């Protein structure tokens, strides 16, 4: 009992946002933990609504799993790089449009490959022979038929099954869909791209929930100049403390106290927790009192996938003028996918993107070994491939600041876990892509949950002041006229 009194007394003596300052300025205070798109959008919105806001970020930069690198002399994204849903309905569209940032559209709506159309590509077998495009298109139709049959199978099942198990059931019922030889290998490449979308292996992806996210219209567009200009614009003027790794969050009726790894403490009326799901799963942030069981179950039961990038910068272009290259194989694990950034940016860059178990295995390699592995895959299809002059390797799975790439639905767990993770706990509010039931795993999903967390926080905190009309509305206010997105496809 005495320790709780001491804790409350410490909060009243806040050295960051003191009670006296709050009474004088009538501005409530919020600590935002995590400087990714979810955290920054929440902080931006709350500060614009006259809150005192501080952002604590563990890295030495903002952006989180959005990381634009300039070491090649031009921008490349090591993390998220697509705008999923190139349309005015996308919550990020107004920001991107006003900045005049160009996008390169890689697919339209309802593409069998999600973020690519079957319009500009080259697939090869392990011997370097190009796969006929007619066969690729034909297998694409078969893949869509299999997915339709999977949906029928899952609707008949009481218990959830994995996508991999569902494939087996479909093949037993519809043997004509079972393929052999090169056709089978092409089908495995489609599975490989599906696994890339979820950053997970088919053995772990839920058949009941795999298609529950909302896909905005307009297809998918690459951010030609990277995402950094967007996050920097949103963060302008915010009080952001980088290098502040949070280790403990104490919540009481009269506020929150946040402790960082170096022993610093900060207090405020409320906190927005916008760290990656993988970090919450790791338990490196201690909560006092513990989070309620329903919240902890949501953290435990949501899946976190891994997709990495090995970005290869070459002296010149030596590959076909297509949007992507691929290698087909007997298993999805053996397949490869290279994104051709030259089509979008004009720079001689290929991006090798492994996901799931393959990504985990590559993370065990050194950067040099990982780059050599990617080049080896490239040499399977282009024997005269040049060595890269520079390379970059992401490690989202082993990075202590992320512990994974993005969330997905695992077998046997309900899709409403995303919403459960978003729901506030007293004066703790949650944001990030893993709290978006409509747009999980996306930048605009993280951004939109930051807006929602800010609104929830605003309403709860300001109720204590009893003067909601003193502050600007956070959401739904009229902003400047939207600017059309700059979209190209060469």
From Swiss-Prot:
Q: Which GO terms describe its molecular function?
A: N(1)-acetylpolyamine oxidase (3-acetamidopropanal-forming) activity; polyamine oxidase activity; spermine oxidase activity
Q: Where in the cell is it found?
A: Peroxisome
Per the entry, the cofactor note is:
Binds 1 FAD per subunit.
Short sequence motif Microbody targeting signal: positions: 488-490
Sorted alphabetically, the keyword list is:
FAD, Flavoprotein, Oxidoreductase, Peroxisome
* The keyword Protease is annotated on this UniProt entry: no
Q: What is this protein called?
A: Polyamine oxidase 2
Q: Which organism is it from?
A: Arabidopsis thaliana
Upper classification of the organism: Eukaryota, Viridiplantae, Streptophyta, Embryophyta, Tracheophyta
